[in-house]
């Protein structure tokens, strides 16, 4: 589960919006 989220989050969010990445990652 964690691996899937990290993968999708790293790929999708990175191409989606940096702001979302910061909110989820941080």
Swiss-Prot record:
Any one GO molecular function term: hydrolase activity
SS bonds (residue pairs): none
Location of the motif Effector region: 16-24
Name used for this protein in its record: GTP-binding protein Rheb
Residues binding Mg(2+): 1, 19
Keywords recorded for this protein, A-Z: GTP-binding, Hydrolase, Magnesium, Metal-binding, Nucleotide-binding
EC number: 3.6.5.-
Function: Binds GTP and exhibits intrinsic GTPase activity.
Root EC class: hydrolase
Catalytic activity, as annotated: GTP + H2O = GDP + phosphate + H(+)
Keyword Iron among UniProt keywords: no
InterPro entries hit by this protein: P-loop_NTPase
UniProt-annotated binding residues for GTP: 1-2, 13, 16, 19
Family note: Belongs to the small GTPase superfamily. Rheb family.
């Amino acid at each position: 589960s964690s691996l899937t989220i990290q993968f999708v989050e790293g790929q999708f969010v990175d191409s989606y919006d940096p702001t979302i990445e910061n909110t989820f990652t941080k």
